[in-house]
Regions:
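N-terminal low-complexity or simple alpha-helical regulatory segments
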Residues: 1-82
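Long, amphipathic alpha-helical coupling/dimerization segments that relay conformational signals between
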Residues: 4-5, 62-178
């Protein structure tokens, strides 16, 4: 990312923070830790990390190699990580700021525009994956998805068997004459 564009993004830090906060409050809450009031204090830390990574000269090469926008978002087996919504809101806020900043400096070279976008996606998603993976490593539900249960914030059905109501229905059906 060009230094001037990065400096302009840094100058928008307050607006990015405010937008991130707003977007975070529109996300679905998947657990008590995912309440926006529990997460907003992480925004400044995350912005520090993101701007530091964007200034790292090796990031451009890694982003180009990774395909930038093709960099995968983090995955949480049980879907309960509060950081999924946190980083999704942050990615959106940063993307909006980048697009507004680029539009303010038209005309812009399409390859530079795409490179900046790729670097932003790469940095945000790499940081998000690192933090989600760390959270998932200590999560009590991290193996729920491996048992064939539901994912992505839905109630997990454990391999131990059906819920008591379902077990009772199955018993009633099994005892009815054919």
């Amino acid at each position: 990312m060009q230094e001037s564009l990065l400096n302009s993004l840094c100058a928008r830090r307050f607006a990015i923070h405010a937008r991130w906060d707003t977007l975070l409050r529109t996300e679905r809450v998947t657990s008590p830790l995912a309440y926006p009031d529990a997460l907003v204090h992480l925004i400044e830390w995350a912005l520090d990390q993101i701007f530091t990574l964007l200034r790292d000269p090796t990031v451009r090469k890694r982003a180009e190699h990774a395909g930038g926008r093709g960099t995968a978002r983090p995955v949480c087996p049980c879907g309960r990580s509060p950081l999924l919504a946190f980083f999704l809101a942050g990615e959106q806020a940063l993307l909006e700021a980048l697009v507004l900043e680029q539009a303010a400096h038209l005309p812009i070279d399409p390859s530079e525009r795409d490179a900046a976008l790729g670097e932003l996606y790469y940095v945000v998603r790499t940081l998000a994956r690192r933090e989600v993976d760390a959270f998932c490593a200590v999560c009590q539900h991290r193996h729920d998805g491996e048992n064939g249960g539901a994912h992505h914030g839905h109630e997990v059905v454990h391999a131990a068997g059906p819920a008591p109501e379902e077990a009772h229905k199955a018993e009633v059906v099994a005892t009815k004459p054919a």
